[in-house]
Amino acid sequence: MKHKKTSSRAIAAQIMLQVLDHGKSLSTLIPAAQQQLDAKDIPLVQEITFGICRVLPRLEAIIQQLVTKPLKGKSRLVHCLLLVGLYQLLYMRIPVHAAVDEVVNATKLVKLDSFRALTNGVLRRFLREQQTILAKVDKHWQTLHPEWLVNMLKQVYPNWREIMDANNQRPPMWIRVNTQHCTPQDYSALLGDLAVKTTNSSACLPSSAIQLVNPLSVDKLPYFSRGWATVQDCHAQWSATLLAAKNGEMILDACAAPGGKTTHILEQAPQAKVIALDIEESRLVRVRENLARLGLTADVRCGDATTPTKWLADDVMFDRILLDAPCSATGVIRRHPDIKWLRQAGDISELVELQAKILSALWHRLKPNGTLVYATCSILPAENSEQIIQFITANPDAELIEMDFNGEKAIMKQFLPQQNGGDGFFYAKLRKLDK
């Protein structure tokens, strides 16, 4: 991509090509593309690309009805332009002529002008035959999920359709109030003064969590730059609460990026000695930014959680460890819809193996009577309850501790997407017995 402002539709198509053909994530591609876009076009590109990922099978089925010969090689970008055009026509309030013309004109910008007529013809044929085409397509279009994931969810959850429906919805915006500055009630009042509607209707939520009825830019949040609030899903906010760090304790936040959990730990225990670890240096930039905004201090380190000896002195042990383990992220598909197409069935066993290695390595660095909170944003038992059962079976010095979710007790807790308005999360809390 060239470093100049260009068509938002062309950029959206190029991003989708990277997702579908090269396995890149939207969370990486969109920030990288922002320098090529006018600021006003960034939300449009986000809406188009995230939206396409949510409903991809339906759009692909429509293209199959309209294009007799698959678009391959260089023309794959034309295929992605058609995805952009169809998404606009079906799901966005953009005038039809503008939706079509912008995509057709983009063929020239991406040096595929020879496909201009085909692109125009396909989109206009869809408009003429939309009712007939959708009647055919929608007989078979149902879950908008890859077959391997549908099968996994069917085996575990009787309400698998509800889960997938939830995955296809737009996620709400949750914030975490920094109680070092004000109470959640007072912050809700500040939002109310700005005519921002909020809710926190479920009892099974951290007290710091507030849901905004309509998403809001962070620069519009009261005193955001001064650290009064952080954007974080309500179920993710249980991580630090369950850890229950105390001032003076030695704490490890493993897999810490982008820093929401690290900062929450320090909001609750400002004098705790926290090491924030992540394997990617580039991801630690966000951790440092979040710490600075909130005026908090942690020891930020780049390292592999499976090999603590490479980033930690041999005699250092932790009172508490928060392990938000690498996972399939199947609980946050509504926030990252590209996950459906980036993950493969074979990834799950590899992730389970990695989680087990990290658990084992970090367990040796936990003090006797110390606690470890294991968390994932997955809804697959292999990464969650099965992983924990296998671990405590293999480690006689590990025991599960009952957790309290505002009066709802559990020794292992699986939140599903949309439950309480939150993302899918799993939690288990382990104590290391002094043997």
UniProtKB/Swiss-Prot annotation:
Biological process terms in GO annotation: regulation of DNA-templated transcription; rRNA base methylation
MF GO annotations: RNA binding; rRNA (cytosine-C5-)-methyltransferase activity
Active site residues of this protein: C377
Protein's UniProt keywords contain Membrane: no
Main location, first listed in the record: cytoplasm
EC number: 2.1.1.176
Cell compartments where the protein resides: Cytoplasm
Keywords, comma-separated and alphabetical: Cytoplasm, Methyltransferase, Ribosome biogenesis, RNA-binding, rRNA processing, S-adenosyl-L-methionine, Transferase
Positions contributing to S-adenosyl-L-methionine binding: C255, A256, A257, P258, G259, G260, K261, D278, D304, D324
Catalysed reactions, semicolon-separated: cytidine(967) in 16S rRNA + S-adenosyl-L-methionine = 5-methylcytidine(967) in 16S rRNA + S-adenosyl-L-homocysteine + H(+)
Pfam families: Methyltr_RsmB-F, NusB, RsmF-B_ferredox
CC annotations in GO: cytosol
Keyword Lipoprotein set for record: no
Family label: Belongs to the class I-like SAM-binding methyltransferase superfamily. RsmB/NOP family.
Protein name: Ribosomal RNA small subunit methyltransferase B
Organism: Haemophilus ducreyi (strain 35000HP / ATCC 700724)
